[in-house]
Amino acid sequence: MDIKPVILNPRSKNITEGKSRAPNRSMYYAMGYEADDFKKPMIGVANGHSTITPCNSGLQKLADAAIAAIEEAGGNAQVFGTPTISDGMSMGTEGMKYSLVSREVISDCIETCVQGQWMDGVLVIGGCDKNMPGGLMGMLRANVPAIYVYGGTILPGHYKGQDLNIVSVFEAVGENAAGRMSDEDLLEIERRAIPGPGSCGGMYTANTMSSAFEALGISLVYSSTMANPHDEKLNSAQESAKVLIEAIKNDLKPRDIVTRKSIENAIAVVMAIGGSTNAVLHFLAIAHAAGVEWTIDDFERVRQKTPVLCDLKPSGKYLAVDLHRAGGIPQVMKMLLSAGLLHGDCITITGQTVAEVLKDVPDAPRADQNVIRPMNKPMYAQGHLAILKGNLAPEGCVAKITGLKNPVMTGPARVFEDEQSALAAILANKIVAGDVMVLRYLGPKGGPGMPEMLAPTGALVGQGLGESVGLITDGRFSGGTWGMVVGHVAPEAAAGGLIALIEEGDSITIDAHQLLLQLNVSDDIIAKRRSVWTAPQPRYTRGVQAKFAFNASTASKGAVLDNY
């Protein structure tokens, strides 16, 4: 039997081999390449390093480690940059409208560079929230052997014996406005909450998506909960590069890994860890990029059979670094696998199946920790990210429902058409228990860009109204949000969804038990309002925001731009 040699440069040879490619090789020689290098794989390193945000300020050392490992293993590293937006810094401003837009820009960057330069593989490094879905969407579009390296979580800050994180500051603003915290304490929390590089420390969007990537098999085990400053993160970046070289040898591609079954695994883990509502939007987009059939109703199907196992912020007690010490995502996955809630036959980037990767992980969590609960004593029997429907959201919307003392609420609508006026009303004590705040024209097209609502929700929590005031929006929520909040309402206001027709004082019901979001107004009144409603003029007519608003799909389909 003849054994065919492994071709490590199946794509890059299109621009490096043959006499006609002499001009191409001249360009490589200008960068220090030698003749022997043209038989090696050209491996992209999509480096998200940036001094815009602490989430990405610690990525260069990981990129350097990965580059060295690629070259040591016989590859050529080709470095290119990907942009980032700091959700935490842009929160509550017009800048937040660029956050979701950046997901698409990142995916476009990766697809463009990998395809345009005929790369044989790509290693993507990211930190802030949209880096993860944007990176994976680009990897799936290009569909060359690829691995994701998460930049790592931040370590907690400390003040007066309490662990702090970025959400602590948002909530402190509300406490201060309510007279429950001094200016001095607010300033100290501001200064101490974020002690160094890494992504926001709770089970917020970045850590949710990195954990989901580990469950998908597109990142290495244990890598999603490591802290950026720790040496094990460097080691993981180096190991990721070596694993990628093997994936190139075996022609193992992202679409081999990201399947309907592996997405179901990832969502089961998101439910078990109490992850961010943004996972719903992003996995709809990821499935679209992978060519996998996955709908908003699939999240509800997984939720109903998956318990919440981890006591993690924002609604729980612990941070991602605590989860790491308790056994990390592999421990959570092994428990779900043993309970028949994961597909053990899914392939991972290492070439091993999920079951093979987890074979040495204990079936039950250690007794000396409280972060991960045993299967027979979960935090909650069912997942926390519920898909609600009703006349306000016939396409669906997303709510965090676990841990609420009052999972059913009917109250008068308090209507706002921008986040800033809603926040001002909260801080001026104009919102009272029982109100249902409506923030609209903030969807994919209306925002545009579906901005997150952490500033208002953080202020509500800080004022002690987190569970007694409802908030619904066609925008999004930060992974740091908790309380009686419902986001991603679809159809959105700008598309003529019923949320556009709500008037001040209307009765609205949020019912987490019945999975219902309902405007309690007669059909005749709704029809009369619709007859005089007109779509608003676009807020942007040029540039990236105009392109996003014109092309974005509904939130129930992931707010993607290529849904043709």
Swiss-Prot record:
The keyword Repeat does not apply. One of its GO terms (molecular function) is dihydroxy-acid dehydratase activity. InterPro entries: DHAD_IlvD/Edd, Dihydro-acid_dehy_C, DihydroxyA_deHydtase, DiOHA_6PGluconate_deHydtase_CS, ILV_EDD_C, ILV_EDD_N, IlvD/EDD_N. It comes from the Bacteria. Its cofactor is [2Fe-2S] cluster; Mg(2+). Keywords: 2Fe-2S, Amino-acid biosynthesis, Branched-chain amino acid biosynthesis, Iron, Iron-sulfur, Lyase, Magnesium, Metal-binding. It catalyses: (2R)-2,3-dihydroxy-3-methylbutanoate = 3-methyl-2-oxobutanoate + H2O; (2R,3R)-2,3-dihydroxy-3-methylpentanoate = (S)-3-methyl-2-oxopentanoate + H2O. Its EC number is 4.2.1.9. Pathway: Amino-acid biosynthesis; L-isoleucine biosynthesis; L-isoleucine from 2-oxobutanoate: step 3/4; Amino-acid biosynthesis; L-valine biosynthesis; L-valine from pyruvate: step 3/4. This is Dihydroxy-acid dehydratase. It comes from Albidiferax ferrireducens (strain ATCC BAA-621 / DSM 15236 / T118) (Rhodoferax ferrireducens). The gene is ilvD.
